[in-house]
Amino acid sequence: MDFSAKIIDWYKKNKRDLPWRNTTNPYFVWLSEIILQQTRVNQGLSYFHSFKKEFPSLRKLASAEEDKILKVWEGLGYYSRARNMHFTAKYIIKNLGGNFPKKYEDLLTLKGVGPYTAAAIASFCFNEPKAVVDGNVMRVLSRFLGIYKPINSIEGQKDLNAAATILLNKRKSALHNQAIMEFGAIQCTPANPHCATCVLNTNCYAYANNKVKILPIKNKKKSIRTRYLNYFTIRYKNAIFLNKRLEKGIWKNLYELPLIESENQFDSDKELLKQIKTKFKTENILIVNKTPEITH
């Protein structure tokens, strides 16, 4: 069976019309890949259009104020992506003459660009025969080939990258990569994949051995630490006090309401009030209202 021919034929008939697929401009491809990290396509689409409108070129992005970039990014989360993007735009303009690197290895030197993003840009924009391996591709290959090593382990990712490279259509690498990613996104889905109508089902290990619900395998994540974030709304006349975060972290340079973080939940308003008075070094504080606790 010609694996690549099957998925490319499927892709031509079933692909979604997404704006970053209609260009080989590395700026727009890079922009889309950074936005889609940790973000679903439906949510990322509007942000892609907003960024393209506000910063239509790499030079425009590089010359923009960070606060403006973060404002357009607002709501996407993982704000370090936006900061890295700004840093990289300035670096390319200043040090590379405004031109993106064309080779996979050179793209990896850019801040915020990992193996997946570097492979995507190299393949889609510069026709480098490099396999693009994201979560969708891992799922397809794990099921099709019967790979039991966890996809979030070093060994599993090594095997999956090797398999993706072997199956890659090197003459049509960009089309092949787009096809297998799309196939994983809408055909070989995490839950309830469409196996009965799958063009690969006659050769699929998971389908033949009733392992579709088992594969791919993922190592369990480490336990999550509980944090208690106590925010306050401080009003003075018609103004509300906001604090700019200066310490390192995912929210660096973002504005927030005044915060007291605690290891445990405060047992009473009295204890909470004591902490507020200590933090703001004043006795003239009154708790007027409390909002319900929100778990995130």
Language model: regions and residue ranges:
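Intrinsically disordered, low-complexity, charged terminal extensions of DNA damage-control enzymes
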Residues: 1-17, 22, 185-296
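Catalytic cores of DNA base-excision repair glycosylases
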Residues: 3-194, 200-209, 213, 280-281
